[in-house]
Amino acid sequence: MELHRAFVVPIFSHSVEGWGDHKEEIISLMDLEKTDHRTGRNYYTDYYKYHKQGIRPKYADRVFDLLEPVFDELDQVFDVSYTLDSMWAQNYPKGGCHELHNHGGLGYSAVLYVQLDETHLPTKFFSPFNDFWHGNLMEYIPNVKEGDIIFFPSVLAH
């Protein structure tokens, strides 16, 4: 019997070379504000300051410079042109989280793990379809570390 993998959810990851040399600089350029927007859950973000206003954050150019080798690889993976529309940062205190959401129905989104200690889990993704045998929701937590970036279909709930 042959197995056919009819649908695949491609997630790409890359480790930023020499991340430890750049981490503090990136963090120093961030200006996060505490929010309890919609959920009452507290976390820190610059989403409403930059993304919602259509402004690029102070750290964007530096991050783009560091990610240039990653974008060169993406050019080889994707057979279509792409643009980077926006960038924002978020920080979660112990026990903090963000409500389940996606980033729209088209394209890819990314998470750069600027700071990730061993006590925090990376982003948890939820399958766009349920387990076929039991009907359960399936989840995936990528094996990433500080300085890694992952690219995922924007439609994926996380």
Task: Label each region the model flagged.
Residues 1-80, 97:
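Non-heme Fe(II)/2-oxoglutarate
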